[in-house]
Amino acid sequence: MASLGKYVSKLAGSRVLVIGGSSGIGFGVAEAAIQNGASSVFISSSSQTKISSAIERLKENNQSAKAQLHGFPCNLGSPDTLTSEVENLFAEVAKSGKLDHVVFTAGDKLAVGKLEDFTLDAIRQAGTVRFFAPLVVAQQLRKHLDESGSSSFTVATGGATEHVSKDWSIMYSYLSGLRGMIRGLAVDLAPIRVNAVAQGPTDTEIWSYVKEMGYWDNVTGHLKGRMTTGEIGKVEDVVEAYLYLMKNKNTSGSVVETTGGTLLS
């Protein structure tokens, strides 16, 4: 069999952890890593049931692949247990050796609403998964990633920071802060590369309720009107941004946009 060549084999033999990998874009990243030759793929989410289901789907969809698949639960939703949960996750993954890439796509409910209605505790909670968890994960990377420019940490964020909407003050604060975090971590963790993917509307399981209630066409019609592509993003397209950041050893401290042209409209 002919060699795949240097342009499509950059992830061959790599070990990839996807935090938030049981569904949506995270699942897509895990599958893409498998199809790009990763030797071991680890996925994590808060639900063991979802992890088991995801691993079965990955095996079914990629029967000819040789990658080893592993899954470990990790609940990022509580500030009180966040550090211990992340430490336990990396302790489990470390039993198989060091990683080459960590991808963070975990998320939770967006704290959108009238600012005065949020307590300080609620404001803090709003950033636990999307802001504080990536920082806590970053604390583990020197120990558990190969310290070289081939290694990377990629974090999902939203493309919404460029458009100011009413009642989004809390989320804008965290989403904007995450972009600064990426630049700081790129310096602090060097030579490990740190980047982010800013995602626009993407058709994932998070929209299931909207589809079930019959609102999908109305909601997406409004969104499409703000997108120069005129199409809601597909997981297989958005995932290409993550592959680019894992493969490109010349990129660190960057935010790659995959928003369907939303930022231009």
Curated annotation (Swiss-Prot):
Pfam family example for this protein?
SDR
Q: Which residues bind NADP(+)?
A: 22-23, 25, 45, 50, 88, 130, 204
Q: Tell me which EC number(s) this protein carries.
A: 1.1.-.-
Q: Which Gene Ontology terms cover its molecular function?
A: oxidoreductase activity
Record's keyword annotation contains Protein transport: no
Q: What induces it?
A: Expression is induced in presence of sodium nitrate, and repressed by glutamine.
List all annotated glycosylation positions: 62, 218, 250
CDD domains per UniProt:
SDR_c
Q: Where is the signal peptide?
A: 1-32
- Which key words tag this protein in UniProt? Glycoprotein, NADP, Oxidoreductase, Signal
Q: Does the record's keyword annotation contain Signal?
A: yes
| Inactivation phenotype | Does nor affect the production of the fusarubins.
What InterPro entries does the database record attribute to this sequence?
NAD(P)-bd_dom_sf, SDR_fam, SDR_superfamily_enzyme
Describe its function. Short-chain dehydrogenase/reductase; part of the gene cluster that mediates the biosynthesis of fusarubins, highly pigmented naphthoquinones responsible for the coloration of the fruiting bodies. The non-reducing polyketide synthase FSR1 is responsible for the condensation of seven acetyl-CoA units to yield a haptaketide. After rings A and B are formed by aldol-type cyclization, the PKS-derived product is released as 6-O-demethylfusarubinaldehyde.
Q: Which family does the UniProt entry place this protein in?
A: Belongs to the short-chain dehydrogenases/reductases (SDR) family.
Q: Can you name this protein?
A: Short-chain dehydrogenase/reductase fsr5
Q: Which organism is it from?
A: Gibberella fujikuroi (strain CBS 195.34 / IMI 58289 / NRRL A-6831) (Bakanae and foot rot disease fungus)
**Encoding gene (name):** fsr5
